[in-house]
Each structure stands twice: as structure tokens, then as C-alpha cells.
């Protein structure tokens, strides 16, 4: 039974898997994008988002926790000074996975894990204006369609006239 066994093993020993993900997180935060297999990308996403959350906290303990996992001090500095401030208003979901297809050599599904660049706007609790009746909305649409219809017929009427002149 697989009780309390979350995560993917990826056909590696525990030490190999941890070392691989430490390297991948370091590269991902350094380049802000990484191409890998789907399974690795899905596992890496959770680790990377935890690192960005540590960067958002910004205290000394969070810095030391991130430095214990990320292998390069310059990348830790980049995380806390450049990457984390971009996501101060975002409550999670800092990365996206884009599937690329299959890799030609071994037919493995490949995807790109990248940071989300679009700034999130907080939802406003403003009241929405009252909706107009459906009949009122349908009338302007019908009027717009009626205006477009004669425009579409005009070129059709000119085309037969052009054919008659060529025959004569």
C-alpha cells in the first residue's frame, strides 16, 4: 500500500532525486525557465513555489532555509531581491507548465516550466451593475446585423455586372 507516500520517485534513489531537484531548482531560478519531462516539471513546480514563498517572507531564517536548498549564493540573492518582490501580491501560482510534446530520442513527454510574468490584479468586491433584460440586448445585435447585411450584398451585385461586360 502507498499510504503517506506522496511524490514521484522517478526511478531514482532518494539521494539522487534530492540532488537532482536541488540542481534543477537552482537552474530554474537562475534562468527563470527550464525544459524537462512532464513528471519532473510537476515535482519541480512545488519545490520552486516553496522557494519563492520563502523569498516573499524575506527574513533571515527564510534566507537560510533557501540557501540550504539552493546551491548558488548568487541565485539565493536573485531570489530574494528580484524574483520574490514580483510576486508580493500573488498568493501562489508563481509558475506555469507548458507542454511541448514528445522528445524524439526516447518519446518522453517534455514541457517547459517558467515563471508567470503577468501581474495579478486583486479581485475587487465592487457591486456589478444590474443586468439589462435579454430582449434589450438582442435588439442592438439585430440592428447591427441588419446594417452589415446590405454591405455584404453590395459586392455580390457588382460581380455579375462585371461578368456581363466581359461576355459582350
Curated annotation (Swiss-Prot):
PROSITE patterns: RIBOSOMAL_L17. One of its GO terms (cellular component) is cytosolic large ribosomal subunit. Keywords: Ribonucleoprotein, Ribosomal protein. Residues 127-144 have a biased composition (Low complexity). Part of the 50S ribosomal subunit. Contacts protein L32. GO terms for molecular function: structural constituent of ribosome. This is Large ribosomal subunit protein bL17. The keyword DNA-binding does not apply. The keyword rRNA-binding does not apply. Belongs to the bacterial ribosomal protein bL17 family. Residues 123-144, 149-168 are annotated as: Disordered. InterPro entries: Ribosomal_bL17, Ribosomal_bL17_CS, Ribosomal_bL17_sf. GO terms for biological process: translation.
